[in-house]
């Protein structure tokens, strides 16, 4: 979609090598791909899970029509800066767009539970269509709906989700 070159065979070989070099434990792998097709892998042990995940609502809004938001990129200075403002006990910051609609967390997709129904913001609100989000939508466990700050503050439960950590219950 963004015109990047990719040698899938070379990436698969590099990933297989990493699996053999890290046979025991739980690791996260970050693949960084340059426009030219050059890539690098970074492997790190996954941190211990935190039992009491806390989130905040970011004061800064995100543009709903930023085409890069639909792709996992390294262009994340705004998200990193907002997360850097908070103490270590804050796992994520939830962003709204300029219309006041919930977008996403700086590192996760957002889900709320209202009347037993799992809801997640619509892609038109400007968010990354994450792997875990897609899985929950395709399974019928969640549905898309435009959500607002008031929804976050008045629901039964809030969850964040990403492919690395799965579905995580959170609190303000």
In which residue ranges do the predicted regions lie?
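Helix-start/capping segments and mature chain N-termini
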Residues: 1-28, 32-172
